[in-house]
Regions:
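A structured, charge-rich N-terminal accessory region that forms the first stable segment of a protein
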Residues: 1-46
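A short alpha->loop->secondary-structure connector
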Residues: 5, 79-89
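A conserved mid-domain beta-alpha-beta active-site/ligand-binding segment of alpha/beta enzyme cores
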Residues: 101-170, 174
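A short, conserved structural fragment
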Residues: 196-211
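Short helix-coil junctions and helix-kink-helix linkers
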Residues: 173-189
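Short, cationic-aromatic polyanion-contact patches
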Residues: 210-225
Length: 225
């Protein structure tokens, strides 16, 4: 739309969840399979490795599009920044990057701001601290990215459950809408589905159907009978 020759690449992996202490992709793959019940994450980590390789011989300045209101894009930015050394970088900050359409994104072209040495050091130090903590989740708190435990979203999920049977997908959607209304996009349906399955297996919810499929599973709060 803007008739620009820029090449666009993205991180693929979602560093808002899973182990980050090392760059061993196999550790992340095994974690996603165990905690989230998703197989095939090796393809995601492979694409992220290709993404990083694109910067090895790069001479041109890079413009990074960042949203501090979206955990996945913010975490992905910090992870990327920790790997690219001192290449010149400019930043475009967009509040809701993942749902911004092409017409809206075009309005941000030309508004990039050079990343200062001080800000680069701050972001890199933040990621190093998150790596040391190596928590199961990263979430947004204000404008900061902080560590969180795997149960972080459980109370929100349970607040949308009722004593009537509901599709798992309906509870997940209600929780995502809650994020949307708050203007902070904390996580996606992959993690929320996995947490609902764990809550059901722990007896916090009753269930019927296929716990691994949001549209084939129904949940409700345990009855008092």
């Amino acid at each position: 739309m803007a008739a620009r020759p820029d090449e666009v690449v993205c991180t693929f992996d979602n560093f808002s969840f899973g182990p980050i202490a090392t760059d061993d992709a196999n550790i992340r793959v095994r974690w996603v399979e165990k905690e989230l019940g998703y197989t095939g994450w090796d393809d995601v980590t492979y694409k992220s490795a290709i993404f990083l390789a694109a910067f090895e011989a790069l001479e041109s300045p890079v413009t990074a599009w960042v949203s501090r209101q979206e955990t996945m894009t913010y975490a992905g930015f910090l992870w990327w920044l920790s790997h690219v050394g001192d290449i010149p970088i400019s930043i475009v900050e967009v509040p809701d990057l993942s749902i911004t359409n092409a017409e809206s994104m075009a309005k941000f072209l030309g508004k990039a701001v050079p990343l200062s040495t001080k800000d680069r050091a701050f972001h890199q130090a933040r990621w190093e601290q998150l790596k040391i903590e190596d928590a199961p989740l990263r979430v947004i708190n204000g404008e900061d990215l902080v560590s969180a435990q795997i149960e972080y979203f459980d109370s929100s999920l349970l607040s949308h459950a009722t004593f009537e049977w509901q599709k798992m997908a309906r509870i997940v959607t209600a929780t995502l809408v809650e994020f949307y209304d708050a203007g902070v996009y904390q996580t996606g349906d992959l993690l929320l589905r996995a947490r609902l399955a764990d809550l059901a297996e722990a007896g916090k919810l009753e269930w019927q159907g296929d716990l691994s499929h949001m549209l084939r599973c129904e949940l409700r709060l345990p009855s008092s009978e």
